Regions:
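N-terminal secretory signal peptides that target proteins for export/translocation
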Residues: 1-9
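Bacterial N-terminal signal peptides
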Residues: 10-25
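Short linear sequence motifs
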Residues: 15-17, 43, 55, 179
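Short secondary-structure junctions and interdomain/linker hinges
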Residues: 18, 53, 57, 71-74, ...
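A ubiquitous, low-specificity "background" feature that marks scattered single residues
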Residues: 23-24, 62, 69, 181, ...
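N-terminal, post-signal peptide beta-strand-biased segments of exported outer-membrane/organellar beta-barrel
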Residues: 27-131, 135-137
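Outer-membrane beta-barrel porins/channels
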Residues: 30-47, 107-317
Length: 317
């Protein structure tokens, strides 16, 4: 159907066009819409090469097996400010500038992690378990284009305000090997924007809808995935701190069955459904501390990351 085909193309374009956000952090820029890499200030300052180190509460995100390195009850929270502009030039030379719906995306992506070493808290009957729960925005986008831009009939605004709730446990088998297991509960929250995936465009005319109408397609759902991880420490110094760490993490894909509406100038035109897949992610890293004493330490870490974007190659509305 022409209406469905038009919105299928528009919604897929909205996810692709939001790639060029600028992150105000010492982190790498990646054209991996809509994935947000930096999920803690310390890890972002190291270019997100943190899978092997994973020794603060953000291990809950980067490598949950690393939570066994923590003692007592620890928390970490923060935010990442996303701003800047997106420049687009069409094959005909037409240009357009997009932004984040203002100078800085608001509300910005944020993260909260709470981690408890159960033995340190007096629950020795549970063995070498560490439990944690976190909340962050590992996927998301927010992009606005002018209503008179060259592709206004495809997109003028898009937002994907996803929230990930992460109940997680880790187990220390011995001083060399730890494992982690967790859930990723993805949902759309009213704390972040309108609480649904949203894309707007200007209608070119036809199908009984006046030309120039502001069109909106939206949808929401809650879904879940899982993650498994390990941390291997073959060498330690005399203080028991790692000199070599090897970390591996697998995050499963998660599938949304979105339900929402087509709107024209704020009035509902039809219901809408779509399937949207968050990709599986494989991460691995090796960290080496050539120097690690009570006075100073120096770490080298090399991480690899594979994201299976082919799983969301198509988006049918």
């Amino acid at each position: 159907m022409p209406l469905a085909q038009r919105f299928r193309r528009a919604l897929l374009l909205c996810l692709l066009c939001s790639a060029a956000g600028f992150v105000f952090a010492a982190a790498s820029a990646n054209a991996q819409t809509p994935r947000l890499q930096g999920q803690s200030a310390a890890a972002a300052a190291m270019g997100n090469a943190f899978v092997a180190q994973a020794d603060d509460p953000s291990a809950l995100h980067y490598n949950p097996a690393g939570m066994t390195q923590l003692h007592g009850f620890q928390t970490l929270f923060g935010t990442t400010l996303i701003g800047g502009t997106t420049q687009f030039t069409s094959p005909t030379g037409a240009q357009v500038t997009g932004d984040r719906n203002g100078s800085v995306a608001w509300p910005p992506p944020g993260h909260v992690y709470l981690v408890a070493n159960l033995k340190d808290l007096g629950l020795s009957a549970l063995g070498n378990f560490t439990a944690g729960i976190g909340m962050n925005n590992p996927f998301g986008s927010l992009t606005r284009y002018p209503n008179d831009g060259p592709f206004r009939t495809a997109i003028t605004f898009t937002t994907l305000p996803l929230l990930d709730i992460k109940p997680t446990i880790a187990y220390k088998l011995n001083d060399q090997l730890s494992f982690g297991l967790g859930a990723d509960i993805y949902t759309f929250s009213g704390l972040f924007g309108e609480g649904h995936l949203e894309q707007k465009s200007i209608w070119p005319g036809g199908l009984g809808i006046p030309a120039g109408s502001l069109m909106e397609i939206n949808g929401s759902d809650t879904t879940a995935g899982f993650n498994v991880s390990l941390l291997y420490t073959p060498f330690r110094n005399s203080d028991g701190k790692p000199l070599v760490n090897i970390g591996m993490v697998y995050r499963s894909q998660a599938t949304f069955h979105l339900t929402g509406n087509f709107l024209a100038n704020g009035a509902s035109v039809a219901g809408a459904t779509a399937t949207f897949v968050l990709p599986q992610v494989f991460s691995g890293g090796i960290g080496i501390w050539p120097v690690r004493t009570s006075e100073r330490e120096w770490k080298l870490e090399f991480d690899v990351d594979y994201t299976g974007w082919k799983s969301n190659r198509n988006l049918d509305v």
